[in-house]
Swiss-Prot record:
GO terms for molecular function: carbohydrate binding; sialic acid binding. N-acetylneuraminate binds at residue 120. This is Sialic acid-binding Ig-like lectin 16. The chain crosses the membrane at residues 435-455. It is found in: Membrane.
Amino acid sequence: MLLLPLLLPVLGAGSLNKDPSYSLQVQRQVPVPEGLCVIVSCNLSYPRDGWDESTAAYGYWFKGRTSPKTGAPVATNNQSREVAMSTRDRFQLTGDPGKGSCSLVIRDAQREDEAWYFFRVERGSRVRHSFLSNAFFLKVTALTQKPDVYIPETLEPGQPVTVICVFNWAFKKCPAPSFSWTGAALSPRRTRPSTSHFSVLSFTPSPQDHDTDLTCHVDFSRKGVSAQRTVRLRVASLELQGNVIYLEVQKGQFLRLLCAADSQPPATLSWVLQDRVLSSSHPWGPRTLGLELPGVKAGDSGRYTCRAENRLGSQQRALDLSVQYPPENLRVMVSQANRTVLENLRNGTSLRVLEGQSLRLVCVTHSSPPARLSWTWGEQTVGPSQPSDPGVLQLPRVQMEHEGEFTCHARHPLGSQRVSLSFSVHCKSGPMTGVVLVAVGEVAMKILLLCLCLILLRVRSCRRKAARAALGMEAADAVTD
């Protein structure tokens, strides 16, 4: 690791003075997995010396001990300055130094990018400062993170199912990875890659798909950098087939399975789940072998096989156990236009949306058998954007009338759940709005003052007329006398 003190001699002793009029705030160490993208937030301030608002401000990020005078920066907003070939098109200065921002975007991070980085600002004839003591260290780690796959515990043959794959590493201005799916249950057309921060897959399983693998692949911009997650499909058997028994139980129930065999010599008994031996007996022990599941869980679903074996042969019977449970962990995943960050929203969340923006809502839950999903807007039922994916609601262009409450319902024979989101739709306000409001306020105030003046003049006029009338009557009385 390159130590920070090695950066300090780059510009000579004159650059080591800590001038309080120059400051920069940046995270000391920035970790990023290899091949991924990260945003380095950075803010700075510098004295107003030798420049005005029309003076261009240039910012430069340099690596390690690079000389700002002769070396190439890794990123800059100065179009006349060449950047280093190794970081071209990957490092980008997204902040505006003229507005106090020096934020940096690093895409497709590589092992050789691991180093210290410092910032330099130039504006006018006097502001030329390198923030050597405020450098940050970029730590490039191995990509160990895997995508998350959301799939029902047990699939019903012949019934459509929706599977969601999410890779939870997303920043604004960072490119989205490419998703693809592979598995025996999928046709070749289902394996085409798509670019997003999550992928929604719909397919209809068959009994032959039971115990096969389904894999979600996430590929990044750099070749060879990828992540994947594999799940094993559990497709329920709808009828007794040969030596297989199908059993449905509710989550939390007590279950005791008994394996017994008559044989001579006595057989060795065993209980096997998939390919894993759960328990076994000795030939000289009891002629039965019990397996207790005191509170069955969703993960207990699968094929349990009772095996009996002695030196003369073997037999086995299988039981497919399906654990039924109502919807759990119901939530909504939201993807907004111009925002690549995927949001997980819980019940009661308020969502601020700009008018005209596109919005994609994906309702996700775990249940067995799969819950029936639907959307409502207020009291009105909203049809799904994709009939095969009732949990997906697409709003291509949000309007002001969309303001209100959107609710996803998950209905199930064992219970139902719902999650509601409150939409607040805002329109973009123009720069003249405040001026118009102020002008209207001033006109209203002037009209109000004018009305008050007219009322006062009217009152004074009435009083004068009344006084004159009174004087006239007094004069008439005097003549009569």
